[in-house]
């Protein structure tokens, strides 16, 4: 095993993929706990399609992908909150509408311009070769922000997640925290798409939270477990991807599915 790790870490692209992937997995899992509990779990899937559309446009016109996609996806996240918040459109319908529309725009722009290039394909399906040094640096900055949010604003996040009316009554700026979570989720998705792909990046948000909820019942317990599960599953998935030459995104998702199954068995045993 140690020999395998030394071999993997001898490649700079593997080091970048491992470092950036672990940081993004941690961010996605922490934000995912709040999103799943607030029943916004599918927002990750919707924003990933928005991100694909924005990245496709950026690649087609030769613009900087991150400079285009981050503000676009962040704006889409805030728009989703606004639409679902006024109660006129259900959250799942709003996500499906924006998701399908953005994906359609991305496909049309790609077809009319560059075609399915390597860059566009990597955004759709993911590639461990796509993680750049700048992506790793941005992932580190994002991780610091997310960790600070959960450490220093834990009580407010707890209140906003479980009871927004109570949070408002205690003076918490609920809208600010909802927007903050949505924007951080958007940035996490954009950074993670290069490696996981638009089709699978939302799994980093959903799986760790749902897996941890099978065993842990407290908010803090779920957060700590989700972060641990996500990081461990990503590491195992990346190793399997390297050993068997399979896509990293798919490998990580399959490992997360295995973790969900194990935690479900533990839950069943504990109930007996």
Feature locations, PLM:
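Transmembrane helix-bundle core of multi-pass membrane transporters
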Residues: 4-16, 95-155
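C-terminal binding/interaction regions
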Residues: 4-10, 124, 128, 229-231, ...
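Transmembrane alpha-helical segments in multi-pass inner-membrane proteins
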Residues: 194-195, 199-250
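Generic alpha-helical transmembrane segments of integral inner-membrane proteins
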Residues: 22, 26, 30, 71-79, ...
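Short loop segments and helix-boundary regions at transmembrane helix junctions
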Residues: 33-116, 212-224, 241-244, 267-269
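Loop-to-transmembrane alpha-helix initiation sites
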Residues: 17, 65-73, 92-96, 140, ...
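Membrane-interface capping segments at transmembrane-helix boundaries
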Residues: 155-156, 265-272
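Helix-loop-helix "hairpin" substructures at the membrane interface of multi-pass membrane proteins
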Residues: 135-208
